[in-house]
Amino acid sequence: MSRYRGPRLRIVRRLGDLPGLTRKSARRAYPPGQHGQNRRKRSEYAIRLEEKQKLLYNYGVCERQLLRYVKKARRAGGSTGKVLLELLEMRLDNTVFRLGMAPTIPSARQLVNHGHVTVNGKVVSIASYQCKPGEVISVKEKEKSKEMVKTNLQYPGLANIPSHLEFDKNKLVGKVNGIVEREWVALQINELLIVEYYSRQA
């Protein structure tokens, strides 16, 4: 599965709110399409698959990337689901989004890919870069970069910055103070179902 570039609201109506993908919320209680209102009991597999798709669309990763994250989380020990969410949340594109520097993860990824973001004073253009405690995330010293972020700060995707991050709006400088806590993950997700999905695929 490649990265999704189609209508975002259609995905939100099918999977529920995806704060990383779009600020729009599902207005209808049933999925899109001609038979959207016909509610059928879903299989356990369908439920696990849906949870996995939430992660894919919210964080903007492809199937292959997510599988790599799952394998890495397994090797790390502890709760695989918790570590999986930490790996996704600590990506540079998501960190830029959670700092309020971009309204969505796709727009944060664009900022990173185009070289507008620095980590410890050096431009990092890899969206999947894993941010670490103590690192400083800031905007490149160019007027265009600063204006883009200043505009984005007026329309943040989420109201609150997580407790493991801090951001100085005047200096446009953020800092990673630790690893994200589970309670600060904005996406409504059951990560255990995703771990189960991949354990059954193995």
UniProtKB/Swiss-Prot annotation:
Q: Which GO terms describe its biological process?
A: ribosomal small subunit biogenesis; translation
One Pfam annotation reads: S4
MF terms in GO: rRNA binding; structural constituent of ribosome
Where are the stretches annotated Disordered? 22-43
Using the record's annotation, list all stretches that form the S4 RNA-binding domain: 90-152
Gene Ontology CC entries for this record: small ribosomal subunit
Could you tell me which InterPro entries the record lists for this protein?
Ribosomal_uS4, Ribosomal_uS4_bac-type, Ribosomal_uS4_CS, Ribosomal_uS4_N, S4_RNA-bd, S4_RNA-bd_sf
Q: Give UniProt keywords alphabetically.
A: Ribonucleoprotein, Ribosomal protein, RNA-binding, rRNA-binding
Name the family the entry cites. Belongs to the universal ribosomal protein uS4 family.
Question: So what does this one do?
Answer: One of the primary rRNA binding proteins, it binds directly to 16S rRNA where it nucleates assembly of the body of the 30S subunit.
Quaternary structure per UniProt?
A: Part of the 30S ribosomal subunit. Contacts protein S5. The interaction surface between S4 and S5 is involved in control of translational fidelity.
Q: Which PANTHER family match?
A: 30S 40S RIBOSOMAL PROTEIN (PTHR11831), SMALL RIBOSOMAL SUBUNIT PROTEIN US4M (PTHR11831:SF4)
Name by which UniProt lists this protein: Small ribosomal subunit protein uS4
